[in-house]
């Protein structure tokens, strides 16, 4: 929309993942006629961080390139073209521009721009340097601005670490438009949400363990009280609020996998917490799974039916995943990152035709010493 309003010609769209690149390209194609585009990305350039959503370029189902000469030819020959690229591959675009006669961009769009903020990296900060990527205008967009505190900036300066701050107007410019969650909800752009804190105390757990021998049902694996409380809290929220589609977030990939493997077994071992006749299906995804396996699990959340579907992950579903059918998310393990929390919440407040609220489930284990 903004490209059309500005009547921009040559445009660069930067995104942090191949998955989000693919989604964005499809949206642009559906809304544009005669769009001339090229995708710049490389498997080698994609970060392999903890549970990042990693997709092989060959799995995108579209033509991609990492050839600088091909990128350069596109820049010269397609004055109204659009280059879609990951931030990680943006140095290839800069290299293609670094020749006489290669035009600058009319517009550069940096999506999920909070990923640029922080410690400067060669790839992600490339777009901030007009000597590398030449452009008339730059537009940065994010749902979760990442503002560095004075203490963090001072420490970085003391350690001679270059940082990019979103509040630095010389890098990111002025704020053009801001829309917060509450206003978006009031304008019916997002659905409202409700935070559900589910407390489970120690006597509840101990009495059920004694009565039902939960430990022995788990093939000899010992399960601590906190983990048991998390399972009970989730099942209680699902039953109390009639939830059908739920994503759980965990500290790590192993914890997410274990939760998926044992959830139904644990819950159904507790007389008072059992799902009873309810059909409950669990699944698990992580960043380095084959894309076909991941997509199967995601698509299950988008099907209609009365069965309960729970999909566990560490963080690969936090950013750039659109599942309007989602009823709830559950933070099974505590989260400290404000950006990670906001991104995860963003998954459950997407509107659909029948959803009035999204639910954010926070299990709380109350041990013997807690009230």
List the model feature ranges, each with a label:
Residues 7, 14-16, 21-82, 92-95, ...:
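Conserved C-terminal RecA-like helicase domain
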Residues 127-134, 147, 152-194:
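Conserved P-loop NTPase catalytic core
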Residues 169-254:
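Conserved interdomain linker/interface between the two RecA-like ATPase lobes of SF2 helicase motors
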Residues 63-67, 101, 115-129, 152-167, ...:
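Substrate-gripping "pore-loop 1 plus following alpha2 helix"
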Residues 1-3:
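Motif I (Walker A/P-loop) of helicase-class P-loop NTPases
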Residues 87-89, 98-140, 144-147:
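SF2 helicase catalytic motif II
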Residues 116, 286-371:
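Conserved RecA-like P-loop NTPase helicase motor core
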Residues 17, 84-89, 112, 141-145, ...:
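A short beta-strand-to-loop transition that corresponds to the Sensor-1 phosphate-sensing loop
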């Amino acid at each position: 929309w903004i490209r059309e309003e500005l009547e921009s010609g040559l445009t660069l769209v930067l995104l942090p993942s191949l998955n989000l690149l693919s989604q964005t390209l499809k949206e642009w194609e559906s809304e544009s006629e005669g769009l001339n585009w090229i995708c710049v990305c490389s498997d080698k350039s994609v970060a392999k961080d903890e549970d990042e959503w990693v997709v092989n370029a060959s799995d995108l189902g579209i033509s991609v390139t990492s050839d600088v000469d091909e990128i350069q030819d596109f820049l010269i020959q397609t004055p109204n073209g659009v280059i879609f690229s990951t931030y990680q591959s943006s140095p290839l675009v800069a290299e293609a521009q670094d020749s006489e006669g290669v035009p600058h961009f009319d517009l550069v769009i940096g999506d999920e721009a909070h990923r640029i903020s922080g410690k400067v990296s060669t790839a992600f900060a490339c777009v901030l340097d007009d000597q590398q990527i030449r452009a008339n205008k730059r537009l940065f967009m994010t749902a979760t601005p990442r503002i560095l505190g004075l203490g963090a900036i001072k420490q970085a300066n003391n350690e001679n670490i270059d940082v990019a701050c979103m509040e630095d107007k010389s890098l990111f410019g002025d704020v053009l438009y801001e829309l917060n969650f509450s206003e978006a909800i009031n304008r019916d752009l997002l659905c409202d949400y409700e935070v559900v804190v589910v407390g489970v105390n120690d006597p509840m757990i101990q009495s059920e363990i004694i009565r039902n021998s939960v430990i022995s049902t788990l093939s000899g694996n010992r399960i601590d009280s906190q983990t048991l409380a998390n399972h009970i809290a989730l099942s209680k929220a699902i039953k109390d609020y009639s939830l059908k589609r739920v994503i759980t977030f965990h500290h790590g990939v192993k914890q997410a996998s274990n939760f998926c493997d044992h959830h139904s077994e644990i819950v159904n071992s507790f007389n008072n917490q059992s799902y009873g006749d309810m059909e409950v299906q669990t699944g698990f995804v992580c960043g380095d799974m084959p894309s076909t396996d991941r997509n199967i699990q995601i698509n299950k959340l988008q099907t209609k039916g009365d069965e309960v579907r729970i999909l566990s992950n560490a963080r690969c579903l936090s950013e750039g995943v659109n599942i309007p059918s989602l009823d709830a998310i559950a933070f099974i393990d505590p989260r400290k990152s404000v950006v990670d929390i906001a991104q995860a919440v963003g998954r459950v407040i997407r509107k659909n035709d029948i959803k009035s609220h999204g639910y954010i489930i926070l299990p709380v284990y109350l041990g013997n010493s807690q009230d």
